[in-house]
Amino acid sequence: MEPCRIRSVVFLASVLALAASAGLAEEAISVTVDATRIRQKLQHIELVVPVKPGPLTLYYPKWIPGEHGPDGPIANLTGLKFEADSKTIPWQRDLLDVFTFHLEIPHGVSHLNATYDYIEPDGVSATDKLLALEWNEVVLYPADIPAEKLTYEAKLLLPDGWKFGTALPVENESGNRVSFKPISLDLLVDSPVIAGEFYRTIDLTPPGEPIHHEIDIAADSADALNMSPENQKEMINLVAESGKLFGARHYRDYHFLLALSDHVAHFGLEHHESNNSRLPERTLLLPSSGMSLGGLLAHEFVHSWNGKFRRPADLTVPYYEQPMKTDLLWGYEGLTDYIGPMLAARSGLWTPDQYHEYLASIAAMLGPGRPGRTWRPLLDTAVGEPGLGFARGGWLNWRRGTDYYDEGDLLWLEVATIIHRESGGKKSIDDFCQEFHGGPNHGPEVKTYTFDELVKTLNAFAPFDWAGFFHTRLASTSAEAPVGGIESGGWKILFNDKPLKLEGRRGNPGDVYSVGLQVGSDGVVTDAIVGSPAFEAGVSSQMKIIGVNGRVYTQELLSDAIKSAKDASQPISLLVVVDGYFRTCTINYHGGARYPHLVRDSDRPDYLDELIKPHAAAQ
């Protein structure tokens, strides 16, 4: 063995690899996405990569910013072939990482051509009438070059007659072909495209605002595009309120990208200059439209400042194959989940009563609805996100999931009340946001932070043991919900038999807080609260209720049975199916319907409503 010689060889190989990488970074990679067959849930991709002879490693994006886990949809990458000079280049998937591909580039080859298809077997992002394109799903990239150093020239082919919206600067359009200006890979991945047969753009720029804002809507029908004048005004207010809150913007212009369909996954994903959000087709036509828009679009919009511009250092990585550390998600997502609803209320998308009901619902869900808090603290829901956040099969109340959103909301509401109290009313959460998220607009950029830097900024506004406060809240295994912010804001939680005035998952029926069940319209139990009357009677997640007190199950019959049990001595009888067997579960509950609400505490001033009053002039 010759250790000195071996070290020299290794060093030389490293230098050559870096030199090759530098060469690859100098010339743009071309990616063309042919979405003309998207109605068949298929996109065809052609990639041209400048290369040098020798080993080449290509990656498919694995750790996607905003998704907080290694969930790049690699299983949807199909038909992969490589060619150079009309000759096939063999490839080998890495033995340990399915996102990694190895090739050997022959001498004399300067460009590698890759062709492959991206399929949508579940229709998560595409329907017969629309497409929500995330570029990380359709690109490959060479190893050892940071995403910000790689340049891509992207092109998109759409079905005839389709229109599109994106924050990407356009080079030119010709027929159904769109060419975008050269852009770094990190900004390409950060700039989704929405397109569709039924499409509409609405200007959301407030009067006097120098930066353009718009919402680009693609829907499964023409009628679904009809946003009311009231919602338009409220969305304009949202933009105005964000400027007032943060005192700065960190984008060239901003696009709310909204897909309206019953056939895509419903969620939102944040980006610097846009957000990719999906809601049911008729969302804009319903009386609850403001609640839906305020619940999703406001959250994703706030991420432009909190999560994209200011980002935890451990969530900021140069390569998409590099793991992220997620322990500060209570800041990334939790603070966003607090500010989003606050701005929804300030803008008029939500009424004060809706904001109150929203807070009551998450407080109740984290109290009697989350016995898992007795063993798994808030911090662990953040740390465990990459592997545990979106576990399926029920039992959410016991194992917990993405509670750094809801519990983070209550955490930051308490922070807001502490700032107000400790500063003698001279400072507010708005002042913190302007300091922490402010600064000059250089367009999309990232300014990282650590826990210590977050604490230091808070101390500058309101000297307090912030580190101790956060450590206590993050490590708590109390069964009680963290409602300090609600109570310090002059309100308290009250349970009564009046239903929540909320839609969707927030408007859960009273069986959650009474017998302890979450049940779908088909009778399938999505969750049975551990320790609740229903759980003690033998009901568990994934069972199916087919009968209530001798009658065929409906949600209404179950609700009626819960109400009637208050004045009856007989228990509630449920006939369930589990693993092909019938079982009768007898629930000994006589408390009646229970729904959470906020009520004023007359012994304390109402600071909560001060926080959600409009702050911008444009209302």
Each predicted region: which residue ranges?
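N-terminal secretory signal peptides that target proteins for export/translocation
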Residues: M1-I6
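Bacterial N-terminal signal peptides
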Residues: V9-A20
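Sec/Tat signal peptide C-region and signal peptidase I cleavage site
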Residues: S21-A25
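Early extracytoplasmic/domain-onset interaction patches
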Residues: E26-I64
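Non-catalytic architectural context of zinc metalloproteases
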Residues: T36, V48-P50, P65, P70-R252, ...
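Juxtacatalytic substrate-recognition/specificity segment
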Residues: D203-L329
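Post-HExxH zinc-binding segment in Zn-dependent metallohydrolases
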Residues: N275-L284, F309-R310, E321-T374
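C-terminal recognition in membrane/secretory proteostasis and scaffolding
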Residues: G340-P341, W350-Q619
